[in-house]
């Protein structure tokens, strides 16, 4: 079975693809340059920008804008899987092997072309580094000893073999996760030290092909992203986006009311209601993907029953 995928076209039209929930925006851009967007938000959870390691909310948002992933979801419909770096795929009759065709003409921020070799390198690298989010891939039976033989670039395509009892549909969905981000192998490996696959360098730099590149990251201070005018869907509307570390929601509200920030990301429900009547501000609501953990006391005679958990 061969499937040709629709390409994601939304990201370039937005200033930045952000997570969901409610946030307040200032349409006037009073105190900020017209070609730059400033977000007031907490970035205290940002500890790395290597897509093989990122597993926090802020880092996830940053790499979603810096890297294209093998597969992606429609921004306006998070149930629709679309093509990212891959433009089509073919599934073998036994359902064990998926062959990805890589979209031609894509370029990294460095100017290097996006190749099938980059895709294979990026996926293998996640397994070999074995950072926290690698479990998203290891469930498919991939490990450092077999991944080179199970994920292979072949003539502009990438062959991926599943080594466990999982549907290829689940694997394709997994390729839309942060670990599915495609990194520039040539650039990353030029910074390799002691066999670290460029990990020490990529924690604080970027090597992607997305609508933005990383210009600056100062821990617990700011992240500055710069538009990629050569992005495959066209350059973003904003030349720069700044994520300014403002941990206190009250300070975020003050900045947006003064026009010193364009978006406040972490307002409390009461604060959102408080600014809703301000004619100079807009409160936006967007869907947000989230994990919900439910814990139960299995020592309880009722809760211990399997049918309750089912």
Question: PLM features: residue spans?
Answer:
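Short, well-ordered beta-strand elements
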Residues: 34-43, 87, 97-100, 119-123, ...
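Ligand-site clamp/hinge motif
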Residues: 200, 228-274, 289
């Amino acid at each position: 079975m061969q499937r040709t995928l629709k390409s994601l076209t939304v990201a370039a039209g937005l200033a930045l693809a952000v997570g969901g929930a409610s946030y307040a925006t200032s349409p006037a851009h009073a105190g900020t340059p017209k070609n730059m967007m400033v977000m007031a938000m907490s970035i205290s959870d940002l500890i790395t920008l290597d897509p093989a390691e990122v597993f926090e909310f802020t880092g996830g948002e940053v790499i979603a804008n810096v890297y294209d992933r093998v597969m992606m979801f429609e921004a306006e419909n998070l149930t629709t899987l679309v093509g990212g770096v891959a433009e089509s795929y073919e599934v073998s009759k036994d359902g064990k092997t998926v062959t990805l065709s890589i979209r031609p003409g894509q370029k990294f921020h460095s100017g290097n072309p996006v190749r099938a070799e980059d895709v294979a390198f990026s996926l293998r690298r996640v397994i070999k580094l074995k950072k926290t989010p690698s479990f998203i891939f290891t469930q498919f039976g991939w490990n450092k000893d077999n991944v080179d033989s199970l994920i292979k670039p072949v003539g502009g395509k990438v062959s991926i073999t599943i080594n466990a009892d999982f549907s290829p549909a689940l694997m394709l969905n997994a390729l839309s996760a942060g670990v599915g981000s495609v990194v520039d192998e040539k650039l990353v490996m030029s910074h390799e030290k002691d066999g670290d696959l460029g990990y020490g360098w990529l924690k604080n730099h970027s090597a992607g092909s997305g609508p933005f590149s990383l210009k600056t990251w100062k821990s617990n201070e700011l992240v500055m992203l710069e538009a990629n005018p050569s992005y495959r869907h066209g350059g973003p509307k904003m030349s720069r986006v700044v994520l300014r570390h403002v941990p206190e929601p009250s300070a975020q509200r003050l900045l947006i009311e003064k026009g010193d920030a364009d978006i406040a990301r972490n307002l409390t429900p009461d604060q959102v209601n408080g600014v809703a009547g301000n004619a100079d501000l807009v409160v936006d609501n967007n869907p947000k993907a989230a994990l919900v953990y439910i814990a139960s006391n299995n020592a309880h005679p009722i809760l211990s029953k399997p049918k309750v958990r089912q």
